[in-house]
Amino acid sequence: MNRLSYLFLPLTAIGVSACSSNKAKEEVKRPNIIFMMTDDHTTQAMSCYGGRLLQTPNMDRIANEGIRMDNCYAVNALSGPSRACILTGKFSHINGFTDNASTFDGNQQTFPKLLQSAGYQTSIIGKWHLITEPQGFDYWCILTGQHEQGDYYNPDFNENGKQIVEQGYATDIITDKAIEYLEHRDKSKPFCMMYHQKAPHRNWMPAPRHLGMFNNTVFPEPATLFDTYEGRGSAAREQDMSIEHTLTNDWDLKLLTREEMLKDTTNRLYQVYKRMPADVQNKWDSVYAQRIAEYRSGKLEGKELISWKYQQYMRDYLATIVAVDENIGRLLSYLEKIGELDNTIIIYTSDQGFFLGEHGWFDKRLSLIHISEPTRQAEIS
């Protein structure tokens, strides 16, 4: 991978294809770009940021061989708007995509269009979540369904305007498609690929191979898990993202048996459960049976119940990230295999961060607001 000295110059000179020397003009091989984005991944769940919850060796590799940004903030704490800001370089009120009910105006300038006009092959594979079809890409294969959030199991895609269904787990499939695209690209041109995972977006559904992997793990609780918000403004008390009150028993905690889901097939959890193959459904039932039994034992209440909910949330959220890290490793290995790793700028980010129990919360949407201390006035004599 490109080290620090190579990370910025190619982006400022992207249209330059040759340089001069006293002896001859030699062609400069322009760098490839892979922009990796996950959904709702937070630094607390990345070991390269000192997170103690999960080891992420492949993300760590990107950080160790490049640079790690320690002071970056999302312009908008919602999925679609954050993506629109990244594409356009504009604030939400200027690019027009202010919330997830908006529709993206693809006619405006975006960085993939600029790269495409400079001779790059451009592609986006995975989550798009901007309603309109992508523009400025030679190839796209984007998740559809669940209001364009996409599904974890047997997901639907829009592939260059054609609707398809793929069998398997979304995080793996998106990587399969990314590698397949790289195999068949025009190798005479540099490429820019936006590699966008759905994971670990709510409701945190791990890959079949990772179901239950943390069932016997007890994760450390944040010091503010039982925060009462005393002395704080009304927003802290009135938020709707608390582990105690907002986590749902069905969608988030998955506290429904197969029989209960079949009694009400309109249930949101059943809509994703029914997409699983029979063997995955059986494993799911087995893994979550213990959780359901614990919850229904009648022994959990008060702070003990909050702690229990926190552990279930962490087990699903972190297990979902494991597949993300594994697949980053697959993609890095493929680039190494074809000899393109050292000529590829790799950027990893998330559309925004996420609370992992801090202040008893599990979601996002907290504005970065800093109020400076008023300047002290000089005494008037």
Predicted regions mapped to residue ranges:
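Formylglycine-dependent sulfatase
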Residues: N2-F8, T12, A18-S372, R376
